[in-house]
Amino acid sequence: MELPLDNVDLSKLSPNFLKFNERISGVAKKANYAIPVSLSTEVLALNGPVLHYILNSAKGGNETAVTQRTASTNQQNTLQNSLKINESDPITKELWEKIQKAAETNGKAKEQGKSKKQGTEKTTTLTLLKTESSQQSNTTKDGKATSDEAIKKTWGDYQKVENGLKGYTFKASVFENWHELLDFSARIARSFTNIHTKETKKGTDIQGVLGIDSTPNALFTSVFAAGGGNYDNFFYKVQDGRADFSNFKNKETSYQNLQKVFSDYKELIDKNGLFVNKGGSYSSNFQKFHQLAYSISSTSGFFYSFAGNSAKRLKFDDGNFIEFPRFTQPVKAPNKTTQSGGENNNKSENNLLGTFEIEDKSKKRESVESSEKSSSGTQSKSKKGKSMKTIYLYKAQIPEGKNKGDNAILITNQTVIDKLEKAAKEDGKSGTQVSTIASKSTTKENQENKIIGYTSTDNLREDNKNIFDIDDLNDEKYDRKIIVSATEEVLEQSNTLQSEEAVVLPAPAKYKASDSTKIAITQEPNLIGIHANEKENEETRKFVNWFLNSEQTWESKKYSKNKQNSNEKRTPAQFFADSASYILPLKKTFDNANKKEDQSKANNKTNSQRTNTYIEKALEIFKGISQNQITSYSDPSDFRSGRFRDGIGSNFNAVVNSKVDFNKFINNFIASLGSDI
């Protein structure tokens, strides 16, 4: 049974974030049954370098550089019917400047990478440039041009087509409502053959224009916005303690608005321009490699959304890839040192598939300058002085002297065995694509340390094609996987999206620009009490009150210099929310939102940390909700809510592949709901 959280002091919380308690079905009385302690919302992250290439190509910027030596009449023909940027609008002008700056940053990163390889080779080029005319000197590439050239390699040439960007006027407001955003996205898709002609996409292909991590969120908020931010016009509402789905079942406003929203999406889907998360494959996995122009995702995912200065990924033989997982070790082919693996008979010589190393936490850390193998060949020291332990992978049986789960794993999947053995036999194939000049001696050494696969305890989904489950080691808290038929790629910084190259905006707050109400989703877990007995109920309320209101002293490295511990006084709820990149909806947080944002930037600058622009945008959005400038949306709570959400999401995601019409989509959706709705 539910437990009303009476006698809990909620006065510090903004009341607008407690209103969802009014939309809980099946409760005996109106009360606060749930408390939001870890809020997030959604943002629209623009890939600045990609969007610059798209807009600059459509406005003729790249074509003009090619035709500057031609007659002025030809230039005018080139620019005729080109895209226009409405720079008379100050918001659009500011956005375009941010996009240009992002492309400049991306291009400079590529040029800096070149300079490291080329040294002083630019001297001759600069001398030649001085002899060119002043007109030609204007075509000297800056960072933006360099960035555009890099993006073009994957996005391909811009095509000037009808219903594309030809004659289109770009303005910042296209990102403020779903109708214009989807129309703009479809125009981009029509303008690039690498998008609209590719029905089947490999992991390294352009995935689309717009990426959406949660299609239920996108559909719910757009339909809610189209209904004026009123639950009476939504799919369902809670009335008299019960959930009422009649608006949807009777094909009233919510059904009709869903049909309009679907029609807008269908234009983009038909041109292969929409990427949706179908379970773990987030938009950021592709946007960070310039494979999307922009995406909508949760503000809690900032630290997963951008690449580092030296991004890596694992590319599979079929052309697909995954971002290089955390907690991953290379699996090396057997060599003279490891071949026996401590075995004492020749019958087991081909039993060993490979080895990998993990930190041996049972050994005391010592400081050493280089890796050294111990006399047994199973213990070594890393360059950081950590004691390392060799783990052996066997295919037939674990030999005497080795212990399953301790220093040995038995591989029973024949596909894994075949792929590891094949990789070990292949000549000249390395597990990492890097530029190296190797001598004969180093070539021999590299062969002895040949990478034939990878193993990881990161959160990976096995596909039984390239990623497989294997046995865990003793005391491991997470499932271990083995990755085969993969090559590690180290990417240039210019080929990835850095956080400073993204322009972060709120997710569309309206369905159409003419809508009177702005909408923003609020999501993530709430603190909920469960009824037990009077004594335990009271103790539960005391805990919740302590969690929300009792300040404690915490050790923190977050805002301290040199990552040294410092003491901070915060409530447990504040500590929890901050640690997980969520927001606790305190009144004072929104009253001091600008001050908090400035302090966050200053702290990040002092500690050379990336500014969490997602949290900054969330604070801005939540401040609007707190001050009644934005209407908060969250799913009304009912035992059928999850089925409704899952059903609309899975059936819409299926449309992205099948491209069926609205009638087929809605019939499949209704069929998935069952008789309860």
UniProtKB/Swiss-Prot annotation:
Q: Which residues form a coiled coil?
A: none
Recorded hits in Pfam families, A to Z, give: Lipoprotein_10 (PF03202), Lipoprotein_X (PF03305)
Annotated region (Disordered) at 104-147, 331-384
Q: Where is the composition biased (Basic and acidic residues)?
A: 104-120, 358-372
Q: Where is the composition biased (Low complexity)?
A: 121-137, 340-353
Q: Check the record and name the InterPro entries matching this protein.
A: Lipoprotein_10_C, Mycoplasma_lipoprotein_cen_dom, P68-like
Q: Which NCBIfam families match?
A: lipo_P68
Write out the similarity annotation: Belongs to the MG185/MG260 family.
Q: What is this protein called?
A: Uncharacterized protein MPN_364
